Amino acid sequence: MSRRNAAVKRPVLPDPQFNSRLASMMISRLMKHGKKSTAQRILSDAFSLISERTGGDAVELFETAVKNATPLVEVRARRVGGATYQVPMEVRQERGTAMALRWLVTFSRARNGKSMSQKLAGELMDAANETGSSVKKREDTHKMAEANKAFAHYRY
């Protein structure tokens, strides 16, 4: 790790097709082996499927899904005197959004379905309706933090 200054955080430019920063971040999470155009096609196909099924704006539904999957607290391991405690900590907004996007992609890939765009569309619609694996993961994370509330004084 560099002893010099911390790396400058580069701003995320909005996606030109959807004019959304979140869409741009999602494309980066979907991308495998540098194939950005494939990731963009998957997201645009998923958005068109969402528009067909719901009749509403897919980008708004996507933003709702990300908001519903974003955790507010998480547990982090902390060693104190030979014992490791799961210490609940608040999640910064950028980290929470990144975790939500990561979970949405992970659980979309794990779904049963024909194409990745169909699986992603299904997971996004479920997350927007506060169901689905990514929202369940957020609830589990919150439950873990609640269960380990006694160790909150070990925060760092």
From Swiss-Prot:
Organism domain of life: Bacteria
Entry keyword annotation includes Signal: no
Gene Ontology process terms (BP): translation
Pfam families reported for this sequence: Ribosomal_S7
Disulphide-bridged cysteine pairs: none
A molecular-function term among this protein's GO annotations: structural constituent of ribosome
Signal peptide feature range: none
GO cellular component entries: small ribosomal subunit
Subunit structure, interactors included: Part of the 30S ribosomal subunit. Contacts proteins S9 and S11.
HAMAP family for the chain: Ribosomal_uS7_B
Family statement: Belongs to the universal ribosomal protein uS7 family.
Protein name stated in the entry: Small ribosomal subunit protein uS7
Native species: Prochlorococcus marinus (strain MIT 9312)
Lineage: Bacteria, Bacillati, Cyanobacteriota, Cyanophyceae, Synechococcales
